[in-house]
Curated annotation (Swiss-Prot):
Keywords: ATP-binding, Chaperone, Nucleotide-binding, Phosphoprotein, Stress response. Signal peptide: none annotated. This is Chaperone protein DnaK. Pfam families: HSP70. Induction: By stress conditions e.g. heat shock. Residues 600-618 have a biased composition (Low complexity). Belongs to the heat shock protein 70 family. It comes from Actinobacillus succinogenes (strain ATCC 55618 / DSM 22257 / CCUG 43843 / 130Z). The keyword Nucleotide-binding applies. The gene is dnaK.
Length: 635
C-alpha cells in the first residue's frame, strides 16, 4: 500500500507531511520552503503558477492572481462573507449558474475546488519528489466549523487534483494529534486555538492513554469560518489607504496595481510588528496624477496595529466561551492551550488567550506545520502504520428534519462524536397518504424555517392507511469526514429512499453563528413557538377525530345536535390559522364541551375501534407526526 500523505490546505499557506518511519515529517517544496503560499496565477502565456512564483508576479498581474480561495469554497455567491470579499479582492468573484461563488479569470469561469486543486497538485508533486513514488491518497484538513458543503467541496478539490481523499479531518484535531503524539503518559484536556489565514476554530480535546493506546476525543468545537489573518491584513491596508488619501488626496482603491503592492506591504508590516514596536511602510511611485508621481511613506506602530484589530481578536474569544460551555468545562480544567495558525504569532493574540485561560499557551508546537503533521499521523493510522492512536471527532451542528407544524425535530445534536448513525420513526399527517417529503435541516433553532435547508427528497408508494399508522423510519448517518447521508424507509412496504447532501446548498459560517446566537437569544420565543405548534397539532387532531365521529354517527344525531358541533369545529379551524395559543386552547375546550352528545351516540359503535387504536398506540411509542406533502399519482 502506498503512503497516505497529510495536507493542510490553508487559506494563506499550505503544507504537506508524511510518516517517515514512525515519525511525521514536513516536506520541503521545490523552492526549498516547508510551507507553500496558497496563491495561483494564470499568466498571459497560459501558464499556471502556484505558490511562491505566483506570489512574486502578483503585483504585475493582480486580476489573474487568485488568493484566499478557501474563503469561497462551498459558499453561495449571496453569502454576506462572499459579498464583502467581492468588494476588496482584486480578482473577479462571480455568481455561478448553481448560485455558488466562482471566480472569473480572463473570461473563464473557475470553481473554487478547481482552483484549490492546483495547490493540492503542488502538494502531491512535492510529496512524490521526496518519496520517489506516485502518491494517490491523502488526508486533507478543514476548519472544524466547515459545514457539509465546504467539506464536500474540499473533497472535490482533492479528486480534481488526482487524489483519493481517504479522510477529511478537522484542523484543531490534527494539531492535537501532532502535539499529543510524543507527550508523556497520562490524561489531559487541551484547548486548540486555531487562527489561520481565513478561518478560526477552537476545539476542546481530551487525550487519554489506555494500555499504550492514545485516544484523542473532541469534547466540543466552535468557530468562525470567515475570520483570519486576511481580515487583519485588510485592516492594515484600509488604514494605509485612508492615511494616503488624507495626505495626497488620492484614493488607491481604484488602482488594482497599487492595492496589490499595498497588500504585500501590509502583510509584511503586520508580521514585522510581531517582533518590532514600529515599522515603516515605504512604497515609492505607488501612483501618479497630473502633478507627478506619488510616494507612500507611513509609520505604523504595534500599538496602532493592535487598535486596528482589537475587535477581531475579541471576536475570536466568543467561540472559545461557547465551546467551553458545550464541553461542560471551566477554564481551570484546561491543562494546556495550543496555538495554531500563523496569525497566533501576533503578541496581542497570545496575550488575550493567556488572559482568558489564565496560563501561557504552549510554545513547542509549530503553528504553521502542526496541522499537516497531524494529518500525516492520521494517514499513518488509516494505512495501518500507526496503531496506537484513536481519533474521535464531532459534528459542529445539530441535524434533523421538519415535522408537523413547521418544527425542526433534531436527530443528531451538535458536538456528537462521528461517525454516527441515528434513526427515529415518524408517521403520516393525512389519511391514505401515499408519499412523504423528507426535509433535511441543519441548525439550532426549533422553528424549521429559521434553520438552513440542506435538501429534501420523496418516499413514495406508501400503502393507504389512516394517518399516524404508517411507520416511516428516518436515518441520519454522518461519516468520518463529517458528510451527511439521510435515508427514509417505509417499514410496512420495505421501500427506501436516500440522499447524500450535495454541496450546492452551502451553509455559510455567519449563518451558523447566527443560528447559535439566535437560539440563545430567542430561547423564550422558541419555547412559545413550540407551545403554539403543540396547541395547533392537538386542535388539528381534535377536529379530525370530531369530523370522523360526525360521519360515523350519521343519522343518530339530529341536525339541531350537529349544528353547534359543526360551528365549534369551524371556529377552532379559524383559530388554528392564527397565532394565539390561548384562543386555540379555548376553542378546543369549547368543541370538547359541545361534543358530549356526539361522544355518547358514537361511544358504543367506536368502542372496538378505540380499543384497537389504543393497543396500536402502545406500539407506536416515540412516533412523531410529521408534516409531509402528498405526492399525487396523477400529476
Amino acid at each position: 500500500m502506498g503512503k497516505i500523505i497529510g495536507i493542510d490546505l490553508g487559506t494563506t499557506n499550505s503544507c504537506v507531511a508524511v510518516m517517515d518511519g514512525d515519525k511525521p515529517r514536513v516536506i520541503e517544496n521545490a523552492e526549498g520552503d516547508r510551507t507553500t503560499p496558497s496563491i495561483i496565477a494564470y499568466t498571459n502565456d497560459n501558464e499556471t503558477l502556484v505558490g511562491q512564483p505566483a506570489k512574486r508576479q502578483a503585483v504585475t498581474n493582480p486580476k489573474n492572481t487568485l488568493f484566499a480561495i478557501k474563503r469561497l469554497i462551498g459558499r453561495r455567491f449571496e453569502d454576506n462573507e462572499v459579498q464583502r470579499d467581492v468588494d476588496i479582492m482584486p480578482f473577479k468573484i462571480i455568481r455561478a449558474d448553481n448560485g455558488d461563488a466562482w471566480v472569473d479569470v480572463k473570461g473563464d469561469k473557475l470553481a473554487p475546488p478547481q482552483v484549490s486543486a492546483e495547490v493540492l497538485k503542488k502538494m502531491k508533486k512535492t510529496a512524490e519528489d521526496f518519496l520517489g513514488e506516485t502518491v494517490t491518497e491523502a488526508v486533507i484538513t478543514v476548519p472544524a466549523y466547515f459545514n457539509d458543503a465546504q467539506r464536500q467541496a474540499t473533497k472535490d478539490a482533492g479528486r480534481i487534483a488526482g487524489l483519493d481523499v481517504k479522510r477529511i479531518i478537522n484542523e484543531p484535531t490534527a494539531a492535537a494529534l501532532a502535539y499529543g503524539l510524543d507527550k508523556g503518559k497520562g490524561n489531559q484536556t487541551i484547548a486548540v486555538y486555531d487562527l489561520g489565514g481565513g478561518t478560526f476554530d477552537l476545539s476542546i480535546i481530551e487525550i487519554d492513554e489506555v494500555g499504550g493506546e492514545k485516544t484523542f476525543e473532541v469534547l466540543a468545537t466552535n468557530g468562525d469560518t470567515h475570520l483570519g489573518g486576511e481580515d487583519f491584513d485588510n485592516r492594515v491596508i484600509n488604514y494605509l489607504v485612508d492615511e494616503f488619501k488624507k495626505e495626497q488626496g488620492v484614493d488607491l482603491r481604484n488602482d488594482p496595481l497599487a492595492m496589490q503592492r499595498l497588500k504585500e506591504a501590509g502583510e509584511k508590516a503586520k508580521i514585522e510588528l510581531s517582533s518590532a514596536q514600529q515599522t515603516d511602510v515605504n512604497l515609492p511611485y505607488i501612483t501618479a496624477d497630473a502633478t507627478g508621481p506619488k510616494h507612500l511613506n507611513i509609520k505604523l506602530t504595534r500599538a496602532k496595529l493592535e487598535a486596528l484589530v482589537e475587535d477581531l481578536v475579541a471576536r475570536s474569544m466568543e467561540p472559545v466561551k461557547v465551546a467551553l460551555k458545550d464541553a461542560g468545562l471551566s477554564v481551570s480544567e484546561i491543562d494546556d492551550v495550543i496555538l495554531v495558525g500563523g496569525q497566533t504569532r501576533m503578541p496581542l493574540v497570545q496575550q488575550k488567550v493567556a488572559e482568558f485561560f489564565g496560563k501561557e499557551p504552549r510554545k513547542d508546537v509549530n503553528p504553521d506545520e502542526a496541522v499537516a503533521v497531524g494529518a500525516a499521523v492520521q494517514g499513518g493510522v488509516l494505512s495501518g502504520n500507526v496503531t496506537d492512536v484513536l481519533l474521535l471527532d464531532v459534528t459542529p451542528l445539530s441535524l434533523g428534519i421538519e415535522t408537523m407544524g413547521g418544527v425542526m425535530t433534531t436527530l443528531i445534536e451538535k458536538n456528537t462524536t462521528i461517525p454516527t448513525k441515528k434513526s427515529q420513526v415518524f408517521s403520516t399527517a393525512e389519511d391514505n397518504q401515499s408519499a412523504v417529503t423528507i426535509h433535511v435541516l441543519q441548525g439550532e433553532r426549533k422553528q424549521a424555517s429559521a434553520n438552513k435547508s440542506l435538501g429534501q427528497f420523496n418516499l413514495e408508494g406508501i400503502n393507504p392507511a389512516p394517518r399516524g399508522m404508517p411507520q416511516i423510519e428516518v436515518t441520519f448517518d454522518i461519516d468520518a469526514d463529517g458528510i451527511i447521508h439521510v435515508s427514509a424507509k417505509d417499514k410496512g412496504t420495505g421501500k427506501e429512499q436516500q440522499i447524500t447532501i450535495k454541496a450546492s446548498s452551502g451553509l455559510s459560517d455567519e449563518e451558523i453563528q447566527q443560528m447559535v446566537r439566535d437560539a440563545e437569544a430567542n430561547a423564550d420565543a422558541d419555547r412559545k413557538f413550540e407551545e403554539l405548534v403543540q396547541a395547533r397539532n392537538q386542535a388539528d387532531a381534535l377536529v379530525h377525530a370530531t369530523r370522523k365521529q360526525l360521519t360515523e354517527a350519521g343519522d343518530k344525531l339530529s341536525a339541531d345536535d350537529k349544528a353547534p358541533i359543526e360551528k365549534a369545529v369551524s371556529e377552532l379551524e379559524d383559530a388554528v390559522k392564527g397565532d394565539d395559543k390561548d384562543a386555540i386552547e379555548a376553542k378546543s375546550q369549547a368543541l370538547i364541551q359541545v361534543s358530549e352528545k356526539l361522544m355518547q351516540a358514537a361511544q358504543q359503535q367506536a368502542q372496538a375501534n378505540t380499543q384497537g387504536q389504543q393497543s396500536q398506540g402502545g406500539n407506536d411509542d416515540g412516533v412523531v407526526d410529521a408534516e409531509f406533502e402528498e405526492v399525487k399519482d396523477n400529476k
